[in-house]
């Protein structure tokens, strides 16, 4: 089978199980299984797959079919302008949380130097994103669990 065929088959399975974005998830999971960027996958959809790669991909699809969040399967979540490592011990950054960053950036001028504290940092997405945008400021992130940091 080639990439296009396994993506279509997997997307059908995900769609039947009411997974949002079944094609996108299938492409991302095949990219993970093959250890290539999604862009490279999309330019090589006719590439024949090895049996071991199909087996690895099917295991990922099965996890997704069971409603495991795609971010946990991939091991990261895109947030603001970066990717953040996530697993079952860390809450997945939500897209609407990016509004917090937008509001903070309105308050803190680029030229200013602030000390920012992030309590209950989890993945660290908020503090890291803010400090990357306001590089003259300093951030401290704390969490009860060392697993999160």
Residue ranges with predicted function:
Residues 55-146:
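SAM-dependent Rossmann-like transferase core, predominantly class I methyltransferases
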Residues 1-74:
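N-terminal auxiliary segments of SAM/dcSAM-dependent transferases
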């Amino acid at each position: 089978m080639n990439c296009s065929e396994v993506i279509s088959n997997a997307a059908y399975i995900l769609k039947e199980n009411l997974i949002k974005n079944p094609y996108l998830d299938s492409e991302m999971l095949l990219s993970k299984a093959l250890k290539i960027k999604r862009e490279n996958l999309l330019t090589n959809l006719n590439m024949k797959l090895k049996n071991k790669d199909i087996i690895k991909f099917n295991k990922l699809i099965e996890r997704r079919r069971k409603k495991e969040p795609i971010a946990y399967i991939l091991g990261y979540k895109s947030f603001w302008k970066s990717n953040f490592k996530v697993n079952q011990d860390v809450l997945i950054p939500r897209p609407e949380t990016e509004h917090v960053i937008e509001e903070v950036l309105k308050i803190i001028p680029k030229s200013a130097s602030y000390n920012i504290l992030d309590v209950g940092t989890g993945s660290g997405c908020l503090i890291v994103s803010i400090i990357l945008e306001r590089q003259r400021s300093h951030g401290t992130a704390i969490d009860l669990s060392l697993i999160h940091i």
